[in-house]
From Swiss-Prot:
The lineage of its organism: Bacteria, Pseudomonadati, Pseudomonadota, Alphaproteobacteria, Rickettsiales. GO terms for molecular function: ATP binding; phosphoribosylaminoimidazolesuccinocarboxamide synthase activity. The gene is purC. This is Phosphoribosylaminoimidazole-succinocarboxamide synthase. It holds the Pfam family SAICAR_synt. It catalyses: 5-amino-1-(5-phospho-D-ribosyl)imidazole-4-carboxylate + L-aspartate + ATP = (2S)-2-[5-amino-1-(5-phospho-beta-D-ribosyl)imidazole-4-carboxamido]succinate + ADP + phosphate + 2 H(+). InterPro entries: SAICAR_synt/ADE2_N, SAICAR_synt_PurC, SAICAR_synthetase. Belongs to the SAICAR synthetase family.
Amino acid sequence: MKTQIYKGSSKILYSAEEDFLLIMAFSDNGILESGEIIEVSGKGVLNNNISSFLMDKLEMIGIENHFIEKINMREQLIQYVEVFPVQVIISSVACGRFVKEFGMDEGYVFDKPIIDFKVRSREFKYPIVNEYQILNFSWLTLDEIKAVKEQALRIYAFLSGLFMGVGIRLVECKLEFGRVLNGEESIIMLTDEISPDNCRLWHIHSNEKLGFELLENKPNKAFESYQLIADRLKEK
């Protein structure tokens, strides 16, 4: 019998039969900016399919990640990873905090993608943290920060091209990384998920928002957009 290890707003982690493996289950829950959790029936199944597909694609281009295989409609088998206490946010277009905090026009295209680090803490509302703080807190080494940034930009470039090929614009995405020990060395590994829950996705021509951004204002249309993204990725 599997044992629950962790329960988040949209995913649950369980123990697996083998050491250093876990089962990650996707729920239908979505979290709003207010902290309220709402249910979007079927979202978990779609996110499992989308994330499995994208992690497989990233593996093909040499991006180490925790995904091993999809077990069923909602669950996947993953590698245990010592997750870093920071999220990596890559943005190529002004959205979210750039509009709220800097007064930028939504949709303004940056010359180059911007990388932000945020503390993985809902309690403290995911504050921005800089590289000097990360080093002083001993969360990552200088080499690890460099490797994470390089991988994050490579992942973002690949995903941007993939989504553009199906008429969807990747505006921003949130990535999580960690380390896996390999003898005396450690490997930097992509973890968590890549889905409409942690990617800002817009229609390429109309800039109509898709995925999690609809949970706030148009929750009745959220499932349709998740389904649209999944269907378009099937074409790849």
